[in-house]
């Protein structure tokens, strides 16, 4: 696993993919340094900055000024905030805006926003002119520690989440920790779920550190930077081993099979459930289901739930506002999960804290019965 290196006010985590390797820069002031960092790596480019209305109001002017100082022309493309922008309609709108600006294949798409903007922009960059340069500038904690790293891009459909997309690695990730100060407490908590996930997958020491230091992560400073860097280091190591998720990269989906089903069931309505909240509930359910299947002790599930509750995250189906459909309908959403192979269910389950594994051929009847029990409690 590549160790992060510290230079000036930022930490650099390398993602090792041969001639497609790139750096993740983590630290304060990277919006102001963006033009300089992009100019170092991509000579003579113009950029399209894809962002949403909320992020644009706070950060777009500073980013455009940074590019202007570096002699880089920029064209903003602003979309509506929220998961519903991960759609064919918005994909078409952004694509047409970039083509109308006459950007060329050697130019770059810059994603300034959270996971929605990053996933959408990366997909656009992968298909416009058969592939443009791509820079991630994640502005949410969730995007900084997860979706901006590793090259997964895409949009949602009526059939489920992230079902249409491409693998498209960025040339650079700039994670400005200062922009996290503008997040709502709910958004920050949602991103923290993905940080906790890395400890639960295979780093029990990191999970224990989070249990002891989560309040400092929330308040900012060195603990926050460390948590982000360690999360990126974990993900970078997995991506380097298994870029296209043919093996253990699937471990990164801990909590996501249940979580994505809940997002689909709530219509991607962020007033009811955001992605990180779905992941938190999904991880709690994965640990509960593992205990039910006699794969792990119930004390591991209780420890996970206790920590997620401590930071203010939901851990049960009862905490999803507006109610949920019957277990059979949730199973329909689970059947659309990307890990389904030839109709058989694959889950990320666990033997304990930091002992996650890929469980294939999980009996659908067992999952259905488990969901019925959890819904009954709700």
UniProtKB/Swiss-Prot annotation:
Family matches, as InterPro entries: Dehydroquinate_synthase (IPR050071), DHQ_synth_AroB (IPR016037), DHQ_synth_fam (IPR030963), DHQS/DOIS_N (IPR030960), DHQS_C (IPR056179)
Binding site for NAD(+): 115-119, 139-140, 152, 161
Main location: cytoplasm
Functional note: Catalyzes the conversion of 3-deoxy-D-arabino-heptulosonate 7-phosphate (DAHP) to dehydroquinate (DHQ).
Gene3D superfamilies: 3.40.50.1970, Dehydroquinate synthase-like - alpha domain (1.20.1090.10)
A single GO molecular function term of this UniProt record: metal ion binding
Keyword Kinase attributed: no
Cofactor, how bound (note): Binds 1 divalent metal cation per subunit. Can use either Co(2+) or Zn(2+).
Biological process terms in GO annotation: amino acid biosynthetic process; aromatic amino acid family biosynthetic process; chorismate biosynthetic process
Protein name: 3-dehydroquinate synthase
Cross-referenced HAMAP family: DHQ_synthase
Cofactor: Co(2+); Zn(2+); NAD(+)
Organism (species): Brucella suis (strain ATCC 23445 / NCTC 10510)
Domain of life: Bacteria
EC number, as in UniProt: 4.2.3.4
Binding-site residues, Zn(2+): 194, 256, 275
Top EC category: lyase
